[in-house]
Amino acid sequence: MRVEWPTLALIILCYAVWGAALFILPGLSVLLSVAIAALTIALHSSIQHEVTHGHPFGTRRIGEWLVFATLNLSIPYIRFRDTHLAHHMDARLTDPYEDPESNYLDPELWVCLPRWMQVVLNINNTLAGRMAIGPIVSQIAFMADEARLIRNGDKHVAFAWALHVVLSAGVLMVVAASVMPVWAYLIACYIGISILKIRTFLEHQAHERARGRTVIIEDRGLLAFLFLNNNLHV
């Protein structure tokens, strides 16, 4: 079995720093612990993304055991995996009906929205807005779609959320047993997701031609590390 040792080492390091942010750093500074926890939460989400594509073992099933519990508490790993892989299988990127990761709406649906909702979505379509309110907007929209699937009898989605509740409860139990206050961890989760919104905001802008919806993100430094240097997104 092929093992990508640098990636595996990064996974171990991510959990080690996350643990330090919970059990050690709050004794020095809660603000510092929140900042470090937020960075590790963002990094963990990037690692989950890598696992969906078969890293670090060359087979997704083994890698999933390392990242099944979502540290940001927002999205079940199973649902992230399924929708993300469906997104990559779709040639019509940004299509609001075909692309499960699209941030766009059908014009006919848009004109039927209340004015206040249009304002919120327009704000969400700026980088500052995506970082500030994007975690809430995307969570509400995603959970509404998921609830619809569950009501329609999708047992796979229901199982994914049931497992997510159990695993998230486990994460929160670890947080509750740590030095970091639970409220501080929830803030760290929000910041971590907000950081991820920087990348997803840049990916797949609407364009008349499909090839115009693929991006190359030129970046260096901390953000490049948190996004694991995945500069090409197709």
Model-assigned labels for residue ranges:
Residues 55-75, 97-113, 210-224:
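Juxtamembrane helix-capping/reentrant segments at transmembrane boundaries
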